[in-house]
From Swiss-Prot:
One of its GO terms (molecular function) is UDP-3-O-acyl-N-acetylglucosamine deacetylase activity. It catalyses: a UDP-3-O-[(3R)-3-hydroxyacyl]-N-acetyl-alpha-D-glucosamine + H2O = a UDP-3-O-[(3R)-3-hydroxyacyl]-alpha-D-glucosamine + acetate. It comes from Shewanella halifaxensis (strain HAW-EB4). It is an enzyme of class 3 (hydrolase). The active site is at 265 (proton donor). InterPro entries: Ribosomal_Su5_D2-typ_SF, UDP-acyl_GlcNac_deAcase, UDP-acyl_GlcNac_deAcase_C, UDP-acyl_N-AcGlcN_deAcase_N. Transmembrane segments: none annotated. Zn(2+) binds at residues 79, 238, 242. Pathway: Glycolipid biosynthesis; lipid IV(A) biosynthesis; lipid IV(A) from (3R)-3-hydroxytetradecanoyl-[acyl-carrier-protein] and UDP-N-acetyl-alpha-D-glucosamine: step 2/6. Gene3D superfamilies: lpxc deacetylase, domain 1, lpxc deacetylase, domain 2. Its cofactor is Zn(2+). Belongs to the LpxC family. This is UDP-3-O-acyl-N-acetylglucosamine deacetylase.
Length: 306
């Protein structure tokens, strides 16, 4: 049987909030089977819990933010959620002492390292997957995103930026998902932004913590980071990373194909909401044998059962 997963023990790190510029402490704790991913604001009294579900995503400007009915928010969840999805972690409690997840280096790689360093524990209940049975599509002008039936999890993603450096890179990628492929090919891709936008963002109290330490920065012609890019196609790979994280608020790993053109956080969330609303387009499945599982998650080293 393919089992649910959590972290073996509590792990903690600190970083900077991308938009606030303030120090943030992030704590990840184990959780029982069928808990899902829960986020908690520990800087509030009493602490406020926000479930990581699609209808709690109420802000998608520059990041994905969960916001409850009282306006309490936790922003910039997408890179952490990509790491959780990529490592197949079903259950965890995420605590932060600020309104956003720390940006770290702008990719999912520090979160992958954090989760792998503390260890991943298989649990005693079957892992649940969302199996797509009919196509679901959302559009916004020339942008679109779609989920289609497929035996594994495949991403077919294209971007279209009118910038010479991005235009020179590969702007279309197709990949079949596995934990190893995610860690090797996607997790290190950093968020990117343009110098021309920084003044506007900071005037609106956004990207106050942004720097070349946690983003790829471009002027009108080139990448400004002294060390350049981590991948030749880092731009499209980061958009895929964002999509991994955004789709994980569906609650489970998806068995299907995700196809997208120029999509971002808003359209990704619209797609998840459209899928959940179209209940005849998917079903919850589990797999008795690992060989039958269409989505390949690396078996945790020294896995134990809880």
């Amino acid at each position: 049987m393919i089992f649910q997963r959590t972290v073996k023990e509590m792990v903690k790190t600190t970083g900077v909030g991308l938009h606030s510029g303030n120090k943030v402490t992030l704590t990840i704790k184990p959780a029982p089977v069928n808990t899902g991913i829960k986020l908690v604001r520990t800087d509030l009294s009493p602490a406020v819990e926000i479930p990581a579900v699609a209808d709690q995503v109420r802000e998608t400007t520059m990041c994905t933010a969960l916001v409850n009915d009282d306006g309490v928010r936790i922003s910039t969840i997408e890179h952490l959620f990509a790491a959780l999805a990529g490592l197949g972690i079903d259950n965890a409690v995420i605590e932060v002492d600020a309104p956003e997840i720390p940006i770290m280096d702008g990719s999912a790689s520090p979160f992958v390292f954090l989760l792998q360093s503390v260890g991943i524990q298989e649990q005693s209940a079957a892992k649940k997957y969302i199996k797509i049975t009919k196509p679901i599509r959302v559009e916004d002008g020339d942008k679109w995103a779609e989920l289609k039936p497929f035996k594994g999890f495949r991403v077919d993603f294209a971007i279209d930026f009118n910038h010479p450096e991005i235009a020179r890179s590969q702007q279309h990628m197709v990949m079949d998902f596995s934990s190893s492929a995610f860690i090797k090919d996607i997790s290190r891709a950093r968020t990117f932004g343009f110098m021309r936008d920084i003044e506007y963002l900071r005037a609106n109290n956004l990207a106050l913590g942004g720097s070349m330490e946690n983003a790829v920065v471009l002027d009108e012609y080139r990448v400004l980071n002294p060390d350049g890019l981590r991948y030749e196609d880092e731009f499209v790979k980061h958009k895929i990373l964002d999509a991994f994280g955004d789709l994980y608020v569906a609650g489970h790993a998806i068995v299907g194909e995700f196809c997208a053109f120029k999509t971002g956080h808003a359209l990704n969330n619209q797609l998840v909401r459209a899928m959940l609303a179209q209940q005849d387009a998917w079903e919850i499945v589990s797999f008795e044998k690992e060989a039958d599982a269409p989505v390949s998650f690396s078996v945790p080293a020294g896995a134990v059962f809880a």
